[in-house]
Design a protein with these regions (language model features):
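Zn2+-dependent peptidoglycan hydrolase active-site motif and core
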Residues: 175-212, 239-248
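Conserved small/polar residues in nucleotide/adenosyl-binding loops
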Residues: 257-264
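Surface-exposed, glycine-biased beta-strand/turn segments
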Residues: 45, 49, 83-193, 224
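A structural signal for short beta-strand/turn segments enriched in small hydrophobics and glycine
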Residues: 180, 219-231
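Short, charged beta-turn/beta-strand-edge "cap" motif at the junction between a beta-strand
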Residues: 188-190, 228-236
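Cationic-aromatic interfacial patches
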Residues: 2-97
Length: 269
């Protein structure tokens, strides 16, 4: 009897796996057209935990361009890309789902694939360098995308926070994660001292709550890894230079604009 039950359970598991696999390659698509636009908060959260090298490797194994592979993976795995989800998506599944996305939503698919390709190409380094001194200092990542904020009225946090383990302003260098051009620099009520860098791919990278700046001006070009300033706790005030209303951290965000002159006045902690 126990042996029969085991066979029944095994058969049910096989059927379940086959159904899940088939959902990626045939039948109805697991999303609506709007899901492949920036109106999709899950897409905007950018929960990607793969390095550029890992993404390139998995894309090559599936014989797909980097952007198309990453877009397909995000759709297949509920907008999460990490080693586990990448390894679970087979070459056959990836190609089949990519082809269906192109067939049903070509404009949206290619636009989002271009965005993902741009992000992977842009991001060359982590914005906080590893400490080389005797006193090792590091940071903690806080996935605070979409969390509630109340300063200036109820709103949602649009970005992510890199928190300083040593809660002292002015000691953690902030590096440009990408090459690009300084588009904005100066004080914002919410973001404090901030700087915005626009890459050649048209993506705007926003660094907020700085304690001080490197000698940079609007229009200057920067390279990936170049010093932008130092991490701080500025902001939440119309008075320029206000500090200390929250812990030391870097607010980091990536923005897309249809205008050639990005504005980040709504960016917030």
């Amino acid at each position: 009897m126990k042996k029969s039950r085991a066979y029944v359970l095994l058969a049910a598991l096989v059927v379940f796996i086959c159904i899940c696999t088939a959902s990626l390659t045939e039948g109805r698509l697991p999303l609506k057209r709007e899901a492949l636009t920036l109106q999709n908060d899950n897409l905007r959260a950018m929960r990607i935990e793969l390095t550029a090298e890992e993404i390139a490797q998995y894309a090559d194994e599936c014989n797909l361009p980097v952007g198309e592979y990453l877009c397909t993976l995000m759709v297949a795995e509920n907008w999460t890309a990490d080693v586990q989800t990448a390894q679970s998506l087979t070459h056959k599944q990836a190609v089949a789902l990519r082809n269906r996305l192109v067939r049903h939503y070509p404009e949206e698919f290619y636009k989002m694939s271009s965005l993902y390709a741009g992000l992977v190409a842009d991001m060359q380094c982590f914005p906080i360098p590893v400490s080389k001194g005797n006193e090792q200092m590091w940071v903690e990542y806080c996935d605070s995308w979409g969390l509630e904020r109340t300063y200036g009225g109820e709103r949602r946090h649009e970005g992510t926070d890199i928190m300083a383990q040593n809660n002292t302003p002015g000691i953690y260098p902030v590096l440009s994660a990408t090459a690009g051009t300084v588009t904005n620099i100066g004080w914002l009520e919410l973001g404090g001292w901030r700087i915005g860098i626009t890459s050649e791919n048209g993506i705007y990278y926003y660094y907020a709550h700085l304690d001080s700046y490197a000698p940079l001006s609007v229009g200057d070009t920067v390279t990936a890894g170049q010093l932008l300033g130092f991490m701080g706790n500025t902001g939440y005030s119309k008075v320029e230079g206000t500090k200390g209303k929250f812990d030391v951290h870097l607010h980091f965000g990536c923005l897309l604009y249809t205008s050639p002159s990005p504005r980040d006045k709504r960016q917030s902690r």
